[in-house]
Amino acid sequence: MTQIADPSILFPPLVKGAAQAITDYRMIEEGDRVMVCLSGGKDSYTLLDILLHLQKRAPIHFEVVAVNLDQGQPGFPKHVLPEYLTRLGVPFDILTEDTYSIVKEKTPEGKTTCALCSRLRRGILYRHAREIGATKIALGHHRDDILETLFMNMFFGARLKAMPPKLQSDDGTNVVIRPLAYLAERDIERYAQAKGFPIIPCNLCGSQPNLQRRVVGEMLEGWEREHPGRLQNILRSLTRVTPSHLLDRDLYDFAGLSVTPAEGDRGFDGEEYPEREFLAGLSNLTLLG
């Protein structure tokens, strides 16, 4: 029988990692009104817990409002989130928009509905953020989501592009933040199990998960099993980009490159990989073990 860990032990490293990401990317500032998008999954529940904790202890004042979108999926348990959020004492809005019918009508039989569903959901949430005066929209994407997106774009889109911790929304009127960007999914999952969150299944619509994303996710899980710490190193590499050692002519002027009296880059020197030193230092920031 699997023993459930104490959430009070699992929570502090998660808070520390999220606080570091928030600080590094200046995600939350004085006077912000943060709209937390709550799906009923482990990630968004954990995100809400962390932000409510930081709200009480951070040296700045910011508001937190939880928002859930009921998309009309059959079997959606409408009572779960209102009851949970009421007990928690956090301000919340439940939006009701029947995007399920639209998605079913527009998506061919057998095809995944996730892309269209996501676009419709995003538009509704952006609009609501404007209506309530939210200055930031907080999403529950974590480290593993970011890395899956990176490799999805490389393998199937031929683009070096991931999922940023902070960005301007595509409608140009909102700022989206991902405070869980530094956190591993397995650590969030352990905490969610320990807390016993009332999880709402994400497959109520009957859509099958994206096969390509599932394959990439399994690949990353395999890497981490065989080489613990590899995923954290890949994430860190996204913060240490050297354009002169890539092939993008828009990022680096290869055509204009010429010999100068200044010292050139050390492209032919041996690389140094202080992996263990880095992981040892980071283990104090997030749960890596």
UniProtKB/Swiss-Prot annotation:
InterPro entries: Rossmann-like_a/b/a_fold (IPR014729), TilS/TtcA_N (IPR011063), tRNA_Cyd_32_2_STrfase (IPR012089). It comes from Deinococcus geothermalis (strain DSM 11300 / CIP 105573 / AG-3a). Signal peptide: none annotated. One of its GO terms (cellular component) is cytoplasm. The thiolation reaction likely consists of two steps: a first activation step by ATP to form an adenylated intermediate of the target base of tRNA, and a second nucleophilic substitution step of the sulfur (S) atom supplied by the hydrosulfide attached to the Fe-S cluster. Its EC number is 2.8.1.-. It is found in: Cytoplasm. Binds 1 [4Fe-4S] cluster per subunit. The cluster is chelated by three Cys residues, the fourth Fe has a free coordination site that may bind a sulfur atom transferred from the persulfide of IscS. This is tRNA-cytidine(32) 2-sulfurtransferase. SUPFAM superfamilies: Adenine nucleotide alpha hydrolases-like. Pfam families: ATP_bind_3. Keywords: 4Fe-4S, ATP-binding, Cytoplasm, Iron, Iron-sulfur, Magnesium, Metal-binding, Nucleotide-binding, RNA-binding, Transferase, tRNA processing, tRNA-binding. NCBIfam families: PRK10696.1. The keyword Membrane does not apply. Homodimer. Belongs to the TtcA family. Its cofactor is Mg(2+); [4Fe-4S] cluster. [4Fe-4S] cluster binds at residues 114, 117, 205. GO terms for molecular function: 4 iron, 4 sulfur cluster binding; ATP binding; magnesium ion binding; sulfurtransferase activity; tRNA binding. A motif (PP-loop motif) lies at residues 39-44. GO terms for biological process: tRNA thio-modification. Catalyzes the ATP-dependent 2-thiolation of cytidine in position 32 of tRNA, to form 2-thiocytidine (s(2)C32). The sulfur atoms are provided by the cysteine/cysteine desulfurase (IscS) system. It catalyses: cytidine(32) in tRNA + S-sulfanyl-L-cysteinyl-[cysteine desulfurase] + AH2 + ATP = 2-thiocytidine(32) in tRNA + L-cysteinyl-[cysteine desulfurase] + A + AMP + diphosphate + H(+). The keyword tRNA-binding applies.
